[in-house]
Amino acid sequence: MEKKLVPQSISKERLQKLEAQATLTPQQEEAKARKIEREKARLKELNIPTESKESKDCSPAGMINPYALTEVILERPLDWSNPRTTDIVERVLGSSMQDLSKGDSVLRAGRDQNAEVKIVDSVLTKTQRGQDGLERILESFNDYDMPPEEKEEAAPKAKKAAQKLDIDDLREQALSSTTITKEISKIILPTKNLRDDNNTVHQYREVGFQSNGAHNLWDTVVQGIAGDCYMLAALSAIAWVWPALLNMDVDIMSNQDEWRLYRYFIGRSKQTYARPSGSGTSTNEILQEGYYKVPIFARSRYWFNGEYWPALFEQAYANWKFPNDSKYNAILQIGGGWPEEALCELSGDSWFTSSGKLMLSSFTDLSLLNFMKSMCYSWKTIKPMVIVTPCWEPLPPMMPGIAAYHAYTVLGYTVSNGAYYLIIRNPWGVTEPTGDGVLSKRDWVIHFDNMKWFNLSKDDGIFALRLDKVRENFWYIAYMY
């Protein structure tokens, strides 16, 4: 059975030292108050409202990564860069990608604890899990063995495949946040029994430490099956701007191949599942599934090489929030939250604060451009910044490829042919918007005095969106300072 991840052997003196480092003196509290007043005055000069009445009906951000969920269901890694993988995701999750990006999709199942969830039969039989299940799905798409195509060419075939599955014509049969399969329910809903129908249990993989200490690898953060996009978008934002903040306390255990990481988090009263400041623990054991050892939760883009540092932060964060739960259940329960609060939680230092939600409806294209210029140096953000899509119903019209109830990282801005664009990263590590306003050419930002290239035509979750489209498709922007 699964092991529990609970705080172990951290000495009282060590914890007191961490608390002391994160606690401000009266003089520092005064300096922080002056800093906040200066920042408010700066935003006022830019004509940016710092206060807004927030709708009580708005939910926190929390969308599951559909590609990761599909891999865990099939127990088989997929090539996320292959356009036809979208067909597999739609088939397994029982919804088109357009429907999966909406607030009532299966990717938000479990967020509303008061909602009644209906369990239905899966399109996959018990014999269709793993290799056999994937091959049967691939065989159902007659054109899958054709050469890979660009997004523009693949989109019509993906739509045609969805029609074959009757997803568009029979929407009432599609999976949703309140209608899920037994297989999906066992994966994304907290449970005391982790055994499935095949009498298998979730596995562990021990990872080395050296390959998991490079916290400046901001573009390797990839979300798993937990709805914690808000935390991972914030993690990527800090790694992009201030990676030194992400150092962790290491304990080498009696067996030198084993170790634990301690991370001190700052309590934020406005966060979902608010907790007092304290430490969380992660181990070198990563949860996996199936013969191919598919990672279940957060991972690095290069997880197959043993790099899992985002998973270690996710474990520690979940352990801080839910110290008495199993590792699996704790991570599931951190789904849904506010990324601007997660920035401060992850910082480990009470000196930092959040800008709060700066509503994009209050910006014009010009004021948003001036704001970004004030927040960037050589096109790159100088403070960790996040951006969130609408989190209410009914949803406004949104571009294909942008998910509702989802948090993203802001990396900077750029200009092309006189038009200005925000450079944004999806913590899924895949899925970008398409259509008018998306910059699909090679462009750049400055990254630690080295030229860092973004291939904006590659589906790696990084995209550049024109300012007017940013205001139309996103709810608010926020940063930590």
Curated annotation (Swiss-Prot):
Annotated S-S bridges: none
EC number: 3.4.22.-
Gene3D superfamilies referenced in this protein's UniProt entry, alphabetically: Cysteine proteinases
Keywords: Hydrolase, Protease, Thiol protease, Virulence
Pfam families: Peptidase_C2
GO process terms (BP): proteolysis
Activity regulation field: Inactive below 20 degrees Celsius and pH 6.0. Inhibited by divalent cations.
Enzyme class: hydrolase
GO molecular function: calcium-dependent cysteine-type endopeptidase activity
Catalytic residues (UniProt): 229, 406, 426
Primary role: Thiol protease. Probably an important virulence factor.
Family according to the record: Belongs to the peptidase C2 family.
Name under which the protein is recorded: Thiol protease
Originating species: Porphyromonas gingivalis (strain ATCC BAA-308 / W83)
